[in-house]
């Protein structure tokens, strides 16, 4: 989940 959230922040 953390990786997906980071991608969305980009």
Curated annotation (Swiss-Prot):
Coiled coil: none annotated. Its main location: secreted. It comes from the Eukaryota. The modification Phenylalanine amide is found at residue 10. GO terms for biological process: neuropeptide signaling pathway. Keywords: Amidation, Neuropeptide, Secreted. It is found in: Secreted. Signal peptide: none annotated. The keyword Plastid does not apply. Belongs to the FARP (FMRFamide related peptide) family. This is CalliFMRFamide-12. It comes from Calliphora vomitoria (Blue bottle fly). The lineage of its organism: Eukaryota, Metazoa, Ecdysozoa, Arthropoda, Hexapoda.
């Amino acid at each position: 989940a953390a990786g997906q959230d980071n991608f969305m922040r980009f």
